[in-house]
């Protein structure tokens, strides 16, 4: 059975109330250099936003130019509001171009706490995040902190990200 967002959200916590505003989002995989996502429009229509990310199981790593092109083209999808963990050295990106295009498309770039974990499969996370943040500051591009929470105990834990951003 498919559930309506308001129906599900209302059972757990009010969609709005007090200082909490609950949004429904999804992380979608970028599949190719055209920026195609692995979720159909009919699913994207039911959410508030999509976070688009490159993952090795859905995207074959290309050159810096190809990886950047895939990310930038994903910005053309009206549901994409965030680019997830653009810090993985397995998928090198041109941060100058990425940040300029994200700013123009009003897409936030994620600073992912899990990328700072030494056990992460992502390569060069800390160094890449520092470079990304410097470029974002140069262009006054917003970032968003994310935890990449695949386990409930990681939700809201930004210790490494907060330390790095100080």
Which residues are covered by each model-predicted region?
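A short, structure-level motif marking secondary-structure boundaries and short turns
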Residues: 56, 83-84, 116-118, 145-148
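Short hydrophobic "helix-edge" motifs at membrane interfaces and signal-peptide entry regions
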Residues: 75-76, 137-140
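Histidine/acidic-residue-rich catalytic or RNA/ligand-binding cores of hydrolases
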Residues: 92-101, 119-135, 152-165
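Short acidic/histidine-rich active-site segments
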Residues: 141-155
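C-terminal active-site rim and adjoining tail of enzyme catalytic domains
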Residues: 112-114, 133, 146
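Extended substrate/RNA-proximal surfaces in nucleic-acid metabolism proteins
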Residues: 2-111, 166
